[in-house]
C-alpha cells in the first residue's frame, strides 16, 4: 500500500462518533461521544446559519470546538454523503481519475464523485480496484509469513502487509481473524515441518562499483554463540539486488562510511582497520534456519539444534550476562560448548575478522531507523572460548530480529522498520500442545457412578433400558452412553418416552428421604388383565381401531415406552356359547382401543352379554363372579351393538355418587385458597 505523506489530505480525517482523531485539540475541549441532542442541534444550526462560520456554530456547544463541529457535519451528518455500496459507474470513474491524477490526490478525485469522501475513494482503490491487489486464494506460504510476522509485530497489519506483495492490510487482517487465528489456536502450525531453504547473501552492490571485476578479501560477521533469530520469510528480491551469493567490490570509500555515520549510526560500526584496509567488504549469510552462520561448525550446529528443540525456553537477550571483553586465549577453555570451533581463519578466507553480536546491540535495533547499519564493537579478534551464561543454564528461548532489506543507492545493510521490535511487547503465550476438550471429555469413575445413580435433583438424559414403574418408583437402570459421553440423538422419539419426575415433585420428595419401591398399582393394562382374570374370570382382548397419532418431540428428549391407562374403553362381552368339545373356559371381554379423548366427553358403551338370564354383567356397580356353567356353543361371527349404560353405572363411573361429589367440592375449596403467586406449570405425564 502506498504510504501517505504527513501533509496529505488534512481534511480526510475520519470522523466517527468520537472526536479523538481530530488533530491538535486544545482549549480543554472534550473528546466524548456526540449525543443525539447535539446532532439535532448542529443540524438545526447549519440549516439556519449555513456552513460559513463554524466558530459561531461552535459557540452554541460548551464543550465542542469549531473543528469538531465542522468534522461532525462533513463526515457524519451531511445529508449529501453517500455511505452505501459502490456502483459500477463509481468504480469506473475512480479508475479513470486515478489514471489521470495518480494515487495521491484523493481530495481532488472525491470532488468528481458526488457524496463520496477522499477517504472512501482511497480505500476503494487500495482494497478493491487496484489491479496489483491479489484476489486469489491464500497460499500456505502466505499463511506462514503472516503467522511468523504476527509473532513479531502483533496486530500491525500495515507492516505485515508489506511482506506480502499484492495483499492489503485489510485483507491480511480479515484473513487472520477468519482463518489463521483459529488454526493457531488449535495448534495447526506446530505440526508443520520447516522446509530447507538455500543460503542468500543479503548485500547491496553500488552500480558504479559493480562494474569493476576486482574482488578482495571479505570480512565475515560471525557470532561467538548462536544468535537466535525468529523465522522471517524473505521478500521478493529483484535480480539486481540479490543474485546467488555476491560479495562487495574491492573498494569501499571512506566517504561512504562517514556519510552513514552522519545519519545517526554509531562510530563503532566501522572496524578499527577500516581506514587502513581499502578492501573490507561485509558479507551476511542467512541460513535456512535464519541464523547468521557463515561457517559450518559442528559445535555451533549442536547449539543450533538445542535451540530448535526448545525455542520457548530462551529468555530475552537483553537480560543475558554477556562478557564485554573476551580474552584471546579463552578459545581453549574446557567448559565452553563451542570450544571445538577453530579460531584460525579458513584457507579460502585468510583475513577473516569475527564480530560478536551483543544482546544489547540487537535490542537497540528496535530504536534505529531504516537504512542504518548494525553497531558492532570494534574488536580485531573475538574468540569462541567463553560461553554465555544462557548456554550454561540450558534454558533457551528464541527472540525476534527484524527482516533485512536492501537500499539501492547505499552500500549498507538496512533493516525493515516494520520488524523493529526485538522482544515481544506483551507476555508471550505458549500454545498448548493438547486440546482442552481432552480434559472436558474425560470421565472419571466418580462421574460414571453419578450417571448410573443420579441424585433426586437431576434428570436422566438418556436411557437404553427402562423399567415401567409408578411415578414414585426410581429407575435404577444404569445409563449406557456411547463412548462414555452424552450424544445428541439424531432421530425423533415419538412414542418411546421415558417418564420424567417433575422438578417440583423432586424438591418436595427430598425432605422425606430416599424413595422406596412400592408395589405395582393396577393402573396398567397388564394389571387390569390380571385382576379381571383372577377376580371375575374375564379375559381382556385389546384391539387397536386407530393407530396412535405420532406426536413430534423435540430432539434430545428421550423417553422409554410406557403403557398408560386408557381413558376410554369400549366393553364388548363375548358370547358365552362355545363348542361342546371344548372344556370350560373363563369368560372373555374384548376391549377395543380407541383414540384417546377426554374421559368425561364420551360415555362408556357396554355390550350386553347373550346370557341365559337377562341381568347383564356390567349393569351393576361391581363385577360379580357367575357360578353357572357356560353352554358350549360356537362364538358368533359378529357382536351385537352395545346397550346404553344405566344411571347407576353412570353415577359410579362418572363421579356422580355422594362421596365423589363431596370430594370434588372439597378439592375446589382447597384449590381456591391457594394464592396465584406465579404462573402455574402444565404437568405433562404422557
From Swiss-Prot:
Location within or outside the cell: Nucleus
Disulfide bonds: none
Domain HTH myb-type: 26-77, 78-133, 134-184
GO cellular component assignments: nucleus
Region (Disordered): 1-28, 315-355, 493-512
InterPro entries: C-myb_C (IPR015395), Homeodomain-like_sf (IPR009057), Myb_dom (IPR017930), MYB_TF (IPR050560), SANT/Myb (IPR001005)
UniProt-listed GO biological process terms: mitotic cell cycle; positive regulation of transcription by RNA polymerase II
Entry annotated with the keyword DNA-binding: yes
Pfam families: Cmyb_C, Myb_DNA-bind_6, Myb_DNA-binding
SMART domains (alphabetical): SANT
PANTHER family: MYB PROTEIN-RELATED, MYB-LIKE DNA-BINDING PROTEIN BAS1
Descriptive protein name: Myb-related protein B
Natural source organism: Gallus gallus
Upper classification of the organism: Eukaryota, Metazoa, Chordata, Craniata, Vertebrata
Amino acid at each position: 500500500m502506498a504510504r501517505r505523506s504527513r501533509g496529505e489530505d488534512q481534511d480526510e480525517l475520519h470522523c466517527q462518533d468520537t472526536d479523538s482523531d481530530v488533530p491538535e485539540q486544545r482549549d480543554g475541549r472534550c473528546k466524548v461521544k456526540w449525543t443525539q441532542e447535539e446532532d439535532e442541534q448542529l443540524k438545526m444550526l447549519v440549516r439556519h446559519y449555513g456552513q460559513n462560520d463554524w466558530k459561531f456554530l461552535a459557540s452554541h456547544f460548551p464543550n465542542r470546538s469549531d473543528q469538531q463541529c465542522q468534522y461532525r457535519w462533513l463526515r457524519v451528518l451531511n445529508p449529501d454523503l453517500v455511505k452505501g455500496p459502490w456502483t459500477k459507474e463509481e468504480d469506473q470513474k475512480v479508475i479513470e481519475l486515478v489514471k489521470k491524477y495518480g494515487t495521491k490526490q484523493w481530495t481532488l478525485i472525491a470532488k468528481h464523485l458526488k457524496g463520496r469522501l477522499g477517504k472512501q475513494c482511497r480505500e476503494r482503490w487500495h482494497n478493491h480496484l487496484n489491479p496489483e491487489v491479489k484476489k486469489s486464494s491464500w497460499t500456505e506460504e502466505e499463511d506462514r509469513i503472516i503467522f511468523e510476522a504476527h509473532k513479531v509485530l502483533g496486530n500491525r497489519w500495515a507492516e505485515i502487509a508489506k511482506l506480502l506483495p499484492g495483499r492489503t492490510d485489510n485483507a491480511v487482517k480479515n484473513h487472520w481473524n477468519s482463518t489463521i487465528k483459529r488454526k493457531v489456536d488449535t495448534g495447526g502450525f506446530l505440526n508443520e515441518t520447516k522446509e530447507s531453504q538455500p543460503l542468500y547473501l543479503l548485500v547491496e552492490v553500488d552500480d558504479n562499483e559493480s562494474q569493476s571485476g576486482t574482488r578482495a578479501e571479505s570480512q565475515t560477521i560471525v557470532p561467538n554463540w548462536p544468535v537466535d533469530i525468529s523465522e522471517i520469510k524473505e521478500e521478493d528480491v529483484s535480480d539486481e539486488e540479490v543474485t546467488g551469493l555476491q560479495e562487495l567490490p574491492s573498494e569501499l570509500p571512506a566517504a561512504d562510511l562517514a556519510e552513514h555515520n552522519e545519519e545517526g549510526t554509531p562510530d563503532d560500526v566501522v572496524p578499527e582497520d577500516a581506514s587502513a584496509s581499502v578492501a573490507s567488504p561485509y558479507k551476511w549469510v542467512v541460513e535456512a534456519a535464519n541464523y547468521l552462520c557463515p561457517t559450518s561448525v559442528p559445535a555451533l550446529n549442536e547449539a543450533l539444534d538445542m535451540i530448535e528443540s526448545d525455542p520457548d525456553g530462551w529468555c530475552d537477550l537483553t537480560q543475558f550476562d554477556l562478557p564485554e571483553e573476551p580474552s584471546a586465549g579463552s578459545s581453549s577453555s574446557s567448559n565452553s560448548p563451542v570450544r571445538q570451533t577453530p579460531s584460525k581463519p579458513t584457507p579460502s578466507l585468510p583475513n577473516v575478522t569475527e564480530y560478536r553480536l551483543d544482546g544489547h546491540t540487537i535490542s537497540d535495533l528496535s530504536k534505529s531507523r531504516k537504512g542504518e547499519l548494525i553497531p558492532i564493537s570494534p574488536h580485531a579478534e573475538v574468540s569462541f572460548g567463553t560461553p554465555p551464561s544462557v548456554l550454561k543454564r540450558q534454558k533457551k528461548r528464541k527472540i525476534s530480529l527484524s527482516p533485512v532489506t536492501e537500499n539501492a543507492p547505499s552500500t549498507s545493510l538496512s533493516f525493515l522498520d516494520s520488524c523493529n521490535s526485538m522482544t515481544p511487547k506483551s507476555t508471550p503465550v505458549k500454545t498448548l500442545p493438547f486440546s482442552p476438550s481432552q480434559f472436558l471429555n474425560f470421565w472419571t469413575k466418580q462421574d460414571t457412578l453419578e450417571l448410573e445413580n443420579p441424585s433426586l435433583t437431576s434428570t436422566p438424559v438418556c436411557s437404553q433400558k427402562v423399567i415401567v414403574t409408578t411415578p414414585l418408583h426410581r429407575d435404577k437402570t444404569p445409563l449406557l452412553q456411547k463412548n462414555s459421553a452424552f450424544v445428541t440423538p439424531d432421530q425423533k422419539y415419538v412414542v418411546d418416552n421415558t417418564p420424567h419426575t417433575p422438578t417440583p415433585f423432586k424438591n418436595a420428595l427430598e425432605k422425606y428421604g430416599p424413595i422406596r419401591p412400592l408395589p405395582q398399582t393396577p393402573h396398567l393394562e397388564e394389571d387390569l388383565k390380571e385382576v379381571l382374570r383372577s377376580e371375575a374370570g374375564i379375559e381382556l382382548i385389546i384391539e387397536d381401531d386407530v393407530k396412535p397419532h405420532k406426536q413430534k418431540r423435540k430432539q434430545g428428549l428421550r423417553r422409554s415406552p410406557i403403557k398408560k391407562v386408557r381413558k376410554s374403553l369400549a366393553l364388548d362381552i363375548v358370547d358365552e356359547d362355545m363348542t361342546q368339545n371344548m372344556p370350560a373356559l373363563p369368560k372373555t371381554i374384548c376391549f377395543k382401543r380407541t383414540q384417546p379423548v377426554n374421559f368425561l366427553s364420551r360415555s362408556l358403551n357396554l355390550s350386553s352379554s347373550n346370557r341365559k338370564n337377562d341381568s347383564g354383567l356390567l349393569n351393576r356397580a361391581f363385577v360379580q363372579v357367575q357360578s353357572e356353567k357356560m353352554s358350549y356353543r360356537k362364538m358368533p361371527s359378529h357382536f351385537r351393538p352395545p346397550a346404553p349404560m344405566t344411571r347407576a353405572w353412570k353415577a359410579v363411573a362418572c363421579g356422580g355418587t355422594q362421596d365423589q361429589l363431596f370430594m370434588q367440592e372439597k378439592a375446589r375449596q382447597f384449590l381456591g385458597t391457594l394464592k396465584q403467586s406465579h404462573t402455574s406449570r402444565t404437568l405433562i405425564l404422557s
